[in-house]
Amino acid sequence: MTKRLSDLFNRPFATDPVIAGVTADSRKVTTGWLFAALPGTKVDGRDFAEGAVAKGAAAILAPEGGLEGLGVPVVRSEDARRAYALAAAAFWGKQPAMCVAVTGTNGKTSVAGFCRQIFTKLGHKAASMGTLGVVVSQPGQPDQQLTPPGLTTPDAGDVAEMIARLADMGVTHLALEASSHGVDQRRIDGVKLSAAGFTNFTQDHLDYHGSMEAYRAAKLRLFDTLTPAGAMAVLNADSEAFPDFAAAAVTSGQSVFSVGEEGQGLRLLSRTPTPAGQDLVVEAEGVVHHLKLPLAGAFQASNVLVAAGLCIAAGEDSAKVLKALETLEGAAGRLQRVGRGPKGGEAYVDYAHTPDGLQTVLEALRPHTAGKLIAVFGAGGDRDRGKRPLMGAIGAKLADIAIVTDDNPRSEDPASIRAAILEAAPGAREIGDRRAAIRAAVALMSEGDVLVVAGKGHEQGQIVAGVVHPFDDVAETLQALEGVDA
């Protein structure tokens, strides 16, 4: 497949070469490709422009200024990242008919997966794209994992290529996670959205964004820039940030579909925890629906309502959407039930790695806990240090037993990270070795207790001093449950 340079940027060029591919990775460049020379956080793509031309690049996309005398057309843009996303979308040229995106500090992965499951239940071939990779579902077939878990939002060129591939596979409905990094870096600017959703907004990623204001602006960009006028914004009305997101949506010409206890589109009238999940009573379009949701936690009730709202915004019947909620399965590592303890009790694994995430999961499990609530958690190295004491305080306050352990210390001293957490966690236990911490927690379990191992979720490694050691919280917890007396 080839396109002219003018086709990618929708404007004429004095020299209009044939373009055979689009990338921002100079290692992928081959004859006839457009290389996007983008400045990054670690390397500057402009430093690789000359090498890209030597490898056969037919044109270069770059920010304003510099890069003279390369011998190929240089397309300059005040917003080169956005231009790259739009050029990649123009090159690949296809996408599923119905694309929805969801942003928020927590819940994106679950909402995207729930949307995929609902769309499939209603007869569509659907996909989700995000932290858990790209998953394709169709009625009567096992799920297909196209790409492994990784970044929430891949590079804009990879997004465009994958979305075109999904369209070629017959996928008609796609749900995307829109991380603040991905939105800020213009990775999904080329996707034509039918609707966008918002879950919640709390402290995270300040190491990247620098301030809560910049972090909020990145999230808001999904609505004030990327979602077109006339589309629907599905917003969690129970979030303190709801007014900001509603204002951005209305200003951009979108209609607001609010969900939650304060919602107008889908109103949660009641929620009752049960051993198997929770019973929900939801009002939609004046009709009251009684649902048995097979998922634990108030936050999951919130997530499923955002997902249901996005599916309704995509044109599905509200009654059928709500009925489909009764068949949902939680995302891997998202309040995932692992099994029962040898002396009773239930063990869960969750991705919670922020103060709000940890608080949400502990508060979610408390109503399901007749005995002790046991939490195993830590905090990542080389990341926002301010959240460490916050997580310690939350763990000590909301769990009956808090065990502080290592969670990707990276280049930092693991003991110093644990110390920062423990300083705000009176009574917490310290077990640095994560495997030993999980086994100690399982040994404490008895009938009526609930254990949650928080931090990694679906991740498959423990990062220590630059080395990724294989580690799977679900597998480790399962082994501890099965072999604690061995």
Curated annotation (Swiss-Prot):
The keyword Zinc-finger does not apply. Its main location: cytoplasm. Its cofactor is Mg(2+). Signal peptide: none annotated. GO terms for molecular function: ATP binding; magnesium ion binding; UDP-N-acetylmuramoylalanyl-D-glutamate-2,6-diaminopimelate ligase activity. It comes from the Bacteria. Its EC number is 6.3.2.13. ATP binds at G104, T105, N106, G107, K108, T109, S110. It is found in: Cytoplasm. One of its GO terms (cellular component) is cytoplasm. UDP-N-acetyl-alpha-D-muramoyl-L-alanyl-D-glutamate binds at S26, T152, T153, S179, Q185, R187. The modification N6-carboxylysine is found at K219. Keywords: ATP-binding, Cell cycle, Cell division, Cell shape, Cell wall biogenesis/degradation, Cytoplasm, Ligase, Magnesium, Nucleotide-binding, Peptidoglycan synthesis. A motif (Meso-diaminopimelate recognition motif) lies at residues 407-410. Pathway: Cell wall biogenesis; peptidoglycan biosynthesis. Carboxylation is probably crucial for Mg(2+) binding and, consequently, for the gamma-phosphate positioning of ATP. GO terms for biological process: cell division; cell wall organization; peptidoglycan biosynthetic process; regulation of cell shape. It catalyses: UDP-N-acetyl-alpha-D-muramoyl-L-alanyl-D-glutamate + meso-2,6-diaminopimelate + ATP = UDP-N-acetyl-alpha-D-muramoyl-L-alanyl-gamma-D-glutamyl-meso-2,6-diaminopimelate + ADP + phosphate + H(+). Catalyzes the addition of meso-diaminopimelic acid to the nucleotide precursor UDP-N-acetylmuramoyl-L-alanyl-D-glutamate (UMAG) in the biosynthesis of bacterial cell-wall peptidoglycan. Belongs to the MurCDEF family. MurE subfamily. This is UDP-N-acetylmuramoyl-L-alanyl-D-glutamate--2,6-diaminopimelate ligase. The lineage of its organism: Bacteria, Pseudomonadati, Pseudomonadota, Alphaproteobacteria, Caulobacterales. The gene is murE.
